[in-house]
Curated annotation (Swiss-Prot):
DUMP binds at R21, R126, R127, R166, S167, A168, D169, N177, H207, L208, Y209. Keywords: Cytoplasm, Methyltransferase, Nucleotide biosynthesis, Transferase. This is Thymidylate synthase. It comes from the Bacteria. GO terms for cellular component: cytosol. Homodimer. HAMAP family: Thymidy_synth_bact. It holds the Pfam family Thymidylat_synt.
């Protein structure tokens, strides 16, 4: 995945020093874009080991419309714990917006259901969009959405996805985001009888925290390895019917994990 290594190099060489909400400090670039063709393999970073289980369970949690960390904790995933309140609640974050966006007239809009239906019935639509950025709810969210809007595109029997990420923790968060949205694209492609196409990742503020710089430099000393293959149970035809056991990552041979502290 040279695309990710190139982004690390770009930030380290050209990034601007910026202050941030956490008080940690960052090197930051704006408006970067990466593109991954899923025909070349599943874009799971190989220059450090990623926890596939956490990526899958987080996406299933989003798709369930859940906003409490209990499901994640019950499955050994702790990535949202720092932001949860005493009851495990996060406020109206991703799952709420994806599955039950509240309209001013009181309607609840299920963006994922609408998206899948539109891909099936009107694949040339330019409105194949899901947004998690709800200005009316942002102040009630434990963490406003970083990966905040995505759009699908159908051409020549292939389904592609572009993600806009307003804020990107490039060392810790972005590898998760790449794999998560590539997985979502493959799932939706399966239930709409399409082949996976390209995942396009567009960034607003893409940054390395000041306490991740040494880790990024270490990662750049590692050569990317062949991408793994993701197998999905072909019997699942409902986007909300997937379970963790329906996914199998094959031939994943990453370099060792690199530890870094999350900025909260």
């Amino acid at each position: 995945m040279h695309q990710y290594q190139d982004l690390l190099e770009h930030i380290l060489s050209d990034g601007a020093e910026k202050h941030d909400r956490t008080g940690t400090g960052t090197l930051s670039v704006f408006g970067h874009q990466m593109r991954f063709d899923l025909a070349a393999g599943f874009p799971m970073l190989t220059t450090k080991k990623l926890p596939f289980k956490a990526i899958v369970h987080e996406l299933l949690w989003f798709l369930a419309g859940d906003t409490n960390v209990r499901y994640l904790q019950n499955n050994g995933v702790s990535i949202w714990d720092e932001w949860a309140d005493a009851n495990g609640d996060l406020g109206p974050v991703y799952g709420k917006q994806w599955r039950s966006w509240q309209a001013p007239d009181g309607r609840s809009i299920d963006q994922i259901t609408n998206l899948v239906q539109m891909i099936r019935t009107n694949p040339d639509s330019r409105r194949l969009i899901v947004t998690a950025w709800n200005p009316a709810d942002v102040e009630q969210m434990a963490l406003p959405p970083c990966h905040c809007l995505f759009q699908f595109y159908v051409a020549n029997g292939r389904l592609s996805c572009q993600l806009y990420q307003r804020s990107a923790d490039v060392f810790l968060g972005v590898p998760f985001n790449i794999a998560s949205y590539a997985l979502l694209m493959m799932m939706i492609a399966q239930v709409t009888d399409l082949a996976p196409g390209h995942f396009v990742h567009t960034f607003g503020d893409a940054h390395l925290y000041s306490n991740h710089l040494d880790q990024a430099r270490l990662q750049l000393t590692r050569a990317p390895r062949a991408l793994p293959t993701l197998r999905i149970n072909p019997a699942v035809r409902d986007i909300f019917g997937f379970r963790y056991e329906d996914f199998k990552l094959e031939n994943y041979d990453p370099h060792p994990h690199i530890k870094a502290e999350v900025a909260v």
